[in-house]
């Protein structure tokens, strides 16, 4: 081991480094390096990935933690961490530098450098005349821990730079160490580094000029090359510095916040006290013996693993939400914990599902438990600010999410860097079918005109492939908080997020998990917002106060289940997707646990494991149910002998193959990543032999293993499904009994769910609910319920729907609105300051009470002549009426202004105008026979292409009577690519298929009718 690389930037030095940290650490090990320092610019974002790669691949190379800084254009250096104190110091330096600036920037001060007491400093001379001045300054403050880092990149002035550095070292008595200034793990990444540099500077590679690297010397180099470039003592000095650096990320220890413990309690005793209180609330009739045993088992393991603070922290957060009237629900593996149920973190009664605590906490796993809590998405910020206020910004921050290049951004950015016209890039992106599993995007690019024999074409494809997955920047996690007992910046650097009042750490959830650090997930859920708004509306209009618990106590309401069985579930949580709605009439849920199964079974795991059809056949009595043993029956009886949930796989491994709880959970984790690393196969022998030893047939053992592989990364936990089923039933109950309130709440909670406001309004109208247009005199910002003269409730659309109408405009409109309403448009013009606001109201036809039509309203908005004396004698506009817009023009204007229309559906309108050939409507399909030829026409309102569908795409078309489910096979989409990719109004000629109450059309011919809409563009929602 001849060398330690002490200056190496990964791709977490965004748009500079051209290799992943994992690639760098593996290549350094391959080249025989003693150590490698990942030193990204003012960042530690990549160090955990390198650390994990060493462990995963059992590498001998040592990782050194450090960071590269530019104090200014003349002074640059690397800081390395010899020990834990130096690491805390480095985190503090990075935090201070980042917090001084907006997101993505940093500003280091001279005081930051002067105050260093523990970090090792490698100064990197720039070759400028000011180097002597900076050497003097650095020597004054950091002499005992200061080196001169000599880089050799074989530029035209390399010999001059070499002499310059040696002179400085002699003059200031600085030891020299060899440094690579590494930006890539292999020389082949040079074109990518050029491309990244061009993206960073916003120009093409050809325009970079002197900013372009002239060679690939800033890659990890071989021993032979390094020995030619550097003196032996310079290489040896790198090893000496590496020997000083003993800090290891595994030495980081998380300390939980402690202020939640009242006097007289220990963390353990206070948790037990809260659980005792919770038992009385959750089990007023007394705790069943089996549940009590589970509670004691959980508490013992929580105490042993030293997790009480974690549970107390979550409990404190949800109690705050409860006090503030914010709806919340714990979900995920936490629903496997009776302790969480007693602490009111989760709402799933453990008597209703088979709880498996090993899925939540495992002694063998030795990791912090994962508790996800969803809060109303419109009020989650209150919870976040409570956490900041309680613990302070020094001790609480959000985890990061690494935003990486995906296909579209990669094509755009690489294409621009190579000088490809933006119109051509748009053409590529518009016509590439990413759902095509057989013809990759590379093949499709060639079909679209990219020349594979040209150098630019070859570079383009290669660079797009390489850059996909590269980090672009750090963003904030959806809600993962890290809270510590001491300053968080001593554990990990903290920086500003893009949102005001938010700070994030430089690690993501996977980094935290790798280091076994606690993360509190404060997530958001739109359905909780909708449910709360629905409850408030019910109380307002019916004087009935409801809660989720009130509804879930009525879990066997067959009227609700009949609605669900008919797949009348648009807007219903978790069972509103195309796939779920197709399964509902087949599975026919009739109780809460059926919903739990329903939510979990329409997942890639059960589908790939071939578990759906056996379950349905057994449920319908078409296939016998048998169990090889009583133990297996106890695990699988509730799902008719078919493993559907992750917990069942874990339990099967325990009862049938003799796995411990921790081993079984390791099996679950291997299942989650088996396609990536194949780790699940190391359990195959143990699983099958364990079953054979216990008397099970080889065929059964192998079938179970195949089902485990089928689950893959898509297996769904029962606890997760059980939590979701609570909200699914609650939202279905509200839709059935209070539809007007339900739709209004959904519309006021957008964006959420699968459906656009237009689709929700269409469904509300199909359910007989009157929907009233936006009106300048009656609307509010949000949609509201109003009572008609008939006594029925109707939905009045709100101002928030209008595109281009400002918040200030809405506020002024309402503040100054007279009790009797506005009498003329000129009144509104005097109140609204921005002409755009008045024009937006006119375009949305919000003046329909004051002007006969929107054209006339627009004219009056623009008409200022009567305000000028010269024109006061001209005839009034009323004597020269404008032509009224046609019904069709009104629909176009509605969609353009608000995204929906209350007028006649475009399909019906086009048919009346004679613009459509004969077709079958959605409400007529149930009269068509199985395998009959049909023609359907509708607006494309949804596309789904699940990963398990083998290239199949599921379209949702909407006509004036309802939704039509269309199945498009891959061969069809390839042959008719233009209509498949771009149609907004689509005609499908195909074969109707019927399975029970499930009807869909298998597409044969796709015809794009979008031109007939002449500007109408209801956007479809696409889900991949």
UniProtKB/Swiss-Prot annotation:
Entry GO MF terms: 3'-5' exonuclease activity; DNA-directed DNA polymerase activity; nucleic acid binding
Annotated keywords: Cytoplasm, DNA damage, DNA repair, DNA replication, DNA-directed DNA polymerase, Nucleotidyltransferase, Transferase
Keyword set includes Methyltransferase: no
Reaction equation(s) it catalyzes: DNA(n) + a 2'-deoxyribonucleoside 5'-triphosphate = DNA(n+1) + diphosphate
Protein role: DNA polymerase involved in damage-induced mutagenesis and translesion synthesis (TLS). It is not the major replicative DNA polymerase.
Family: Belongs to the DNA polymerase type-C family. DnaE2 subfamily.
Protein name per UniProt: Error-prone DNA polymerase
Species: Vibrio vulnificus (strain YJ016)
Name of the gene this protein is made from: dnaE2
